[in-house]
Structures are given as C-alpha cells and as structure tokens.
C-alpha cells in the first residue's frame, strides 16, 4: 500500500480522524467537522449547525464554514504530499461568496485533487513553488449552494 492510500485509510477511520483533529485541529473537532469522502480526485467534508458553530443570526458562523471548506481542500493536499518526496503546503489566499443562510448540515466538496497532484509533481521536478486555486462548494441538505470558497494553496518541494 502506498503512503497516500495509507493516509486515506487512516483519516477515513472516524476514530483516527477524531484523534488527529483533537491533536492538530482542535477547533475542527469541537465544531464537529466530519470527513465523508476522500479520493485522489475529491474530498467531502460536513459541518453541522449547532451551538458551537452558530452566529447571532441563527446560522453557521462564516469562519466555521471557512474551516470546513479549507479542510476539504487541505486534506486532499495532505494526502498528495504523502505520496512522494517531502513538500511544504501553505494557504496563501482565500475568497468566499455566500449565497444563502447556512443552517442544518452543510456539505463541502472540493474536486481539485488532480490539480494538487500536478502542482506537487511539478514542484518536486523543478524545485520551484507552485500554486493551486481550489474551489470548495458548500451545499445544504436541500442541495442549495450556501457558499463557495476559493482557497489558494502554495506547494514547494523540500530540499
């Protein structure tokens, strides 16, 4: 089993993911983020509306939505980083559009796995940094888009 597959198997185990989040991303753990799917192509993360994620307007606080959107792209990046030589990853940009009040369970999907893998391959081959614009779209239980986040990741192979 390659390193990316081993990483995917670990984080898709609910208990191991909770331990990872408790240790490395405690706010994500407190907010109740869950990884529903992780493939080389896409990741799906959910965040519930609850006491710890609410804002004064009876919807999910925008920073909690950003955390879920970032995890959907970041967990893919972590998986692809595991697949080869060491590389660093960093968020260098974030934009968001909000189109509807976020209540209930919000599901973020980020389909940018192939672009992340390509940027990492190029960085490992050239030693130069590469950026990827990942789009993480959040939908509510009715399937309506509530937010679209554009997260710019920078990848650089370590020497």
Report each predicted region and the residues it spans.
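Residues located in well-ordered beta-strands
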Residues: 34, 95-97, 109-111, 135-137, ...
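Catalytic strand-loop segment that frames the active site of acyl-thioester-processing enzymes
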Residues: 30-60
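Active-site helix/loop of acyl-thioester processing domains in fatty-acid/polyketide metabolism
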Residues: 63-83
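Short structured motifs
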Residues: 29-35, 92-98, 119-121
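Alpha-helical membrane-targeting segments
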Residues: 1-30, 52
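Hydrophobic beta-strand-centered segment that forms part of the acyl-chain substrate-binding groove
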Residues: 76-115
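A generic structural signal for short beta-strands and their flanking turns/coil linkers
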Residues: 31, 41-43, 85, 90-94, ...
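HotDog/MaoC-like acyl-thioester-processing domains
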Residues: 1-12, 102-103, 113-159
């Amino acid at each position: 089993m390659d390193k990316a597959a081993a990483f995917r198997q670990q984080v898709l185990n609910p208990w191991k993911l909770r331990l990872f989040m408790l240790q490395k991303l405690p706010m994500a753990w407190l907010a109740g983020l869950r990884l529903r799917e992780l493939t080389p192509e896409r990741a799906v993360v959910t965040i519930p509306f609850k006491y710890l994620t609410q804002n004064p307007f009876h919807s999910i606080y925008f920073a909690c939505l950003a955390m879920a959107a970032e995890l959907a792209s970041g967990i893919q990046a972590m998986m692809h980083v595991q697949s080869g030589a060491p590389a660093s990853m960093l968020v260098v940009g974030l934009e968001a559009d909000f189109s509807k009040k976020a209540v209930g369970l919000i599901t973020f999907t980020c389909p940018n796995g192939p672009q992340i893998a390509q940027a990492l391959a190029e960085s490992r081959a050239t030693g130069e940094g590469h950026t990827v614009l990942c789009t993480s779209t959040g939908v509510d239980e009715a399937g309506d888009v509530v937010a679209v986040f554009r997260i710019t990741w920078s990848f650089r192979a370590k020497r």
